[in-house]
Each structure stands twice: as structure tokens, then as C-alpha cells.
């Protein structure tokens, strides 16, 4: 069947509504980064312990998807989506009232579970309505809009923290959730009709079938490595930029947001180029840019150039990430034709579970200075490139057919 290579207005509207939902996860990660040093002081704990609030969020975001995926295949997409957003809102309010670290960690775990449900639904809805090039373009458009989160969230969070403290940042996440809940209730339709729903019997067999399919597993691992890179950057950036490079919380938010623009631009480039070059080539080009940018930042910092080298290098790396992620996502999701909720759940679980390991490692390395942290990022970039090249080798025929439609 011949597919369109341009997106109709209805798809643009759907992508905008889905992107608002998809922003909840990144906002829950990025918006409070500048607040972490202040949170450590107020809660009388270490920076590394406050970083655990990010780690548990990511673990819940990953593990929760394994439970949520079959649920969305059985019940449809709309009701689980609204429930997940409501949980996210309640947990954000709870986190804003935390007086001790363990309360914050519990609230962030619950918030991650709510975000897990929303992420599964977003991924599944795209594949419910599109495949091939159109799906890749929708994922790229989604990532372009979601790319605003790492640009705006740290800046907004830094400003809120400067004037009102970190608790206001958590309440802002609750307000974003409320806006998303209203928009979803009004404008997001059900995309999985009852005839296409499947019972959750044999959930473990479904997951095993998907996981052992190399057409799924390799792009899933490559995408997970790319997000490991991203969260390794996130996990160390706040401390390195503020302690070693002397930025204030507000200035950090602006600089971090500026590097986040690169993800948005990379996703935009991916959406424009995918029909011409195919998903495999784009993913390889993006992964090599990640490696090159990280190496540039490392060499510049080693030579004493400081932030003047780190920011351009990370801009290049994050541009590559934005280009690669939509292509890798399309290859992983395109490997399956049914149980798409379970496919999205397994992809998200692998992605977030591996990514969650990056934040404590990066936090520990960043406490030793910029060079160990940047070396860690360069090694992560090398892993992304290796896995992406392996993915491209098993996807050439598939990628060619996508590019031709």
C-alpha cells in the first residue's frame, strides 16, 4: 500500500495533543534539575541522594510500562491515559510537600508510574494510526515538539526556584499535568477499537516473543544507549555547570536549555530527511554525531577551554541524539504488527531501566570534576554508535522500503 510522505492536518493535531502528554515525562526530569543542590541543603542530605529522586522516577517509568502495556492493549488507550495523568498530578503535589528524602522518593516513584502509563499510550497511539514513513514522520514531529521540554523546562524550573524555591517547581509539574488532562479529555480520541483489543493472557510469552526478535531488540538497545547518554548528561550537568563553571541556578537553566535546542533541531531534521534517506542512515549519522560531539567536549575541557568547549560539543551530540531517536524508535516499533501496547511497554522498560543506571554513575563521576564525566559520555557515545551500526546492518531492506514509500 502506498503511503503519504506528508502529514495531514489531522495528524498534526493528533501529534500536538500526544506531544503535550509526552512532555510530562521529560518535564518531570528536566524541570527540577537546577533545584537539586538547594533540595539537598533543605532536606539535609547529599546531592547524590537527591539524584536518587531522578533514579527512582526513571525506574518506575521503565518498569511501570511492563504492567501498563498489556493493560492498554486490553482496555484501549484513552481510559488508561487519563488515569495515568491523574496519578502524575497527585504525585507532583505530594512531592511538593515532602519534608524528608524518603517522602520525596516515594512521591517521585508514584509520579514515574503515572508517567509510564502515559508514555505507553503515546507510543501505541502513533502506531495505531500510522506505520512506515508516516510513523517515522509522526515520531519525529512528536520528538520535535517534546524537544521543547529540555529547552524550556530547565529555564522555567531555574526561574521558579530562584524566586519561589523547589516546591514551586513540583507544583508547576502538577499544573502542567492538569492542563494535559483537560486537553486529553477534550481532544484525544480512542485509537484502539474493541475489535483490535487483545486479552492479557500469556503476557510473559508476548514479551518473550518481542524481546527475542532481533528486528526489535537491536534498535531498542541502541535507543536505550542513546537515552543512557542523555541521562548521563542530565545527571552530571547541574553540578558541573554550577560548581565547576560557576553558573547560577537561573543561568544553568538557560545554558542547559540552549543545549536542549539541539535535540529539537535534530528531530526536525530527521522528520524532513527520513523519506529521502531512510531510518537506518539517519540513525547512523545521528549516533556518529553523538560520539563526535562528546569527544569534542572532552578534548576541549582537557585542553582547558572549559564551558566554551563543552557547550558546543554537547550541542552537536544532542543534535545527533534528536536525529537518531525518532529513526530508532520507528525501527523498533515497526518491527511488530500486533500487541503494540506491549511492544511500546517493552521498549520503554528497556530504555528507562538502562537509562536509570546513568544518573547515579554520572552524579558520582561529576563530583570528581568535568573530565571523568565527559569521558563517561564519550564511552556512552561509542556504545550508541556500535549498537546503531549493528541495527542498520539488519535493517537495510526494511529501511530502503520505508524510504521508498
Give the predicted meaning of each segment.
Residues 2-7, 189-220:
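Juxtamembrane intracellular "pre-TM" segments in multi-pass secondary transporters
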Residues 107-148:
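Cytoplasmic helix-loop-helix junction between adjacent transmembrane helices
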Residues 42-44, 76, 97-103, 114, ...:
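Helix-breaking motifs and short loop linkers at transmembrane-helix boundaries and internal kinks
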Residues 331-367, 377:
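A late C-terminal transmembrane helix in Major Facilitator Superfamily
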Residues 87-94, 102-110, 308-316:
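Paired small-residue
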Residues 63-102:
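Conserved MFS/SLC helix-loop-helix module at the cytosolic interface between two early adjacent transmembrane helices
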Residues 65-76, 266-279:
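Helix-to-loop junctions at the C-terminal end of transmembrane segments
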Residues 103, 132-133, 140-186:
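Helix-loop-helix hairpin linking two adjacent transmembrane segments in secondary transporters
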Amino acid at each position: 500500500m502506498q503511503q503519504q510522505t506528508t502529514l495531514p492536518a489531522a495528524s498534526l493535531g493528533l501529534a500536538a495533543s500526544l506531544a503535550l502528554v509526552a512532555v510530562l515525562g521529560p518535564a518531570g526530569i528536566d524541570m527540577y534539575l537546577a533545584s537539586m543542590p538547594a533540595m539537598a541543603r533543605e532536606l539535609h542530605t547529599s546531592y547524590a541522594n537527591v539524584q536518587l529522586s531522578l533514579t527512582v522516577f526513571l525506574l518506575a517509568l521503565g518498569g511501570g510500562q511492563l504492567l501498563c502495556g498489556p493493560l492498554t492493549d486490553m482496555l484501549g488507550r484513552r481510559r488508561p491515559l487519563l488515569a495515568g495523568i491523574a496519578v502524575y498530578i497527585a504525585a507532583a503535589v505530594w512531592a511538593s510537600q515532602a519534608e524528608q528524602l524518603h517522602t520525596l522518593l516515594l512521591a517521585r516513584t508514584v509520579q514515574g508510574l503515572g508517567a509510564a502509563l502515559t508514555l505507553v499510550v503515546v507510543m501505541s497511539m502513533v502506531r495505531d494510526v500510522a506505520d512506515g514513513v508516516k510513523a517515522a514522520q509522526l515520531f519525529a514531529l512528536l520528538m520535535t515538539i517534546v524537544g521543547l521540554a529540555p529547552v524550556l523546562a530547565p529555564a522555567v524550573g531555574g526561574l521558579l526556584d530562584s524566586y519561589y524555591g523547589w516546591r514551586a517547581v513540583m507544583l508547576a509539574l502538577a499544573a502542567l499535568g492538569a492542563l494535559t488532562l483537560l486537553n486529553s479529555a477534550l481532544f484525544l480520541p480512542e485509537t484502539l477499537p474493541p475489535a483490535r483489543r487483545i486479552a492479557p493472557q500469556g503476557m510473559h510469552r508476548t514479551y518473550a516473543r518481542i524481546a527475542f526478535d532481533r528486528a526489535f531488540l537491536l534498535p531498542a538497545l541502541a535507543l536505550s544507549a542513546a537515552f543512557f547518554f542523555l541521562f548521563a548528561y542530565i545527571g552530571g550537568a547541574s553540578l558541573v555547570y554550577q560548581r565547576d563553571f560557576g553558573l547560577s541556578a537561573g543561568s544553568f537553566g538557560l545554558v542547559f536549555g540552549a543545549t536542549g535546542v539541539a535535540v529539537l533541531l535534530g528531530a526536525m531534521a530527521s522528520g524532513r530527511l527520513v523519506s529521502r534517506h531512510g531510518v537506518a542512515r539517519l540513525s547512523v549519522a545521528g549516533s556518529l554525531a553523538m560520539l563526535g560531539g562528546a569527544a569534542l567536549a572532552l578534548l576541549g575541557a582537557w585542553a582547558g577551554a572549559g564551558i566554551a568547549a563543552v557547550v558546543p560539543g554537547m550541542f552537536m551530540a544532542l543534535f545527533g541524539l534528536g536525529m537518531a531517536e525518532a529513526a530508532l524508535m520507528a525501527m523498533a516499533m515497526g518491527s511488530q504488527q500486533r500487541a503494540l501496547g506491549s511492544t511500546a511497554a517493552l521498549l520503554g522498560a528497556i530504555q528507562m531501566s538502562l537509562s536509570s543506571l546513568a544518573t547515579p554513575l554520572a552524579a558520582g563521576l561529576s563530583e570528581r570534576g568535568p573530565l571523568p564525566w565527559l569521558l563517561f559520555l564519550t564511552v556512552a557515545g561509542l556504545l550508541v554508535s556500535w549498537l546503531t551500526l549493528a541495527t542498520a546492518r539488519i535493517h537495510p531492506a526494511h529501511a530502503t522500503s520505508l524510504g521508498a514509500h
